[in-house]
Design a protein with these regions (language model features):
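Acidic, Ser/Thr/Pro
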Residues: 1-228
């Protein structure tokens, strides 16, 4: 099947945008300027209590961060999105909480600062949908968080992506997917430049990427051996 992209849908710098996908459709997230972190959340379109869960995803994949072929799973442990293509260096994050108003207060802001937590609702409200609760556990696309050699300490670093780098996520169920072009301009995460948040772009693809199959959950080897 050929890739039929929709016109680019811009996530304005520091703001949110959401899309509804049918199972088998894909969304491409484009780092237009090469420096922007994009937070991502997803929900079952028919049950907003079922949401994409980073904790359950790490158990399912046994990866700290996703690679092509990995699925993100929900709070009910069902695959919801699968990473089917990645033209970036593959540096993303599933650990850091999305920024919220309180985060910026702790960083010294005395006035309201745009944040990913509010952007989640901004994007979904454009679709007429209100998630039942806030979820700080986002998939942080293009964010560069490194585990240091002591295997304990995390380092928050600038992005290593290039202009036009992208990832593509395939919907495994009908779902809402929300994105935030992260407004963070205090902690240096937005590339090696002036840390200014920038636009990112989305494209909806009518392509199921059939060569990328959904993998089952990780199971300890002694259990898989016993089943043979």
């Amino acid at each position: 099947m050929s890739v039929i992209p929709s016109p680019a849908l811009t996530i304005p710098a520091g703001h949110g945008k959401a899309v509804r996908l049918k199972a088998g459709q894909s969304v491409r997230v484009i780092n237009t300027h090469g420096t922007q972190v994009v937070d991502c959340w997803a929900w079952n379109a028919y049950d907003l209590e079922e949401y994409m869960c980073m904790e359950a995803t790490r158990v399912w994949t046994q990866h700290l961060n996703p690679v092509v072929g990995d699925s993100f799973v929900t709070s009910a442990r069902h695959p919801i999105l699968t990473l089917v293509d990645d033209t970036s260096p593959g540096v993303h994050d599933t650990f850091m909480a999305a920024c919220d108003r309180r985060r910026y207060e702790l960083l010294g802001c005395t006035h309201y600062h745009r944040n990913c937590s509010d952007n989640l609702f901004e994007g979904m409200l454009e679709l007429g949908v209100t998630p039942p609760r806030r979820n700080l556990a986002s998939f942080n696309i293009f964010m560069n968080i490194r585990v240091l050699p002591d295997n304990i300490t995390l380092a928050t670093l600038p992005t290593v992506t290039r202009p036009g780098d992208s990832i593509t996520l395939r919907a495994e169920m009908d779902c809402f997917v929300a994105f935030s072009a992260c407004p963070q301009d205090i902690v240096n995460i937005q590339g090696e430049g002036d840390n200014t948040p920038k636009d990112a772009d989305l494209q909806i693809l009518d392509d199921a990427f059939p060569s990328v199959k959904v993998k089952g959950p990780w199971v300890p080897e002694h259990l898989t051996s016993a089943q043979r």
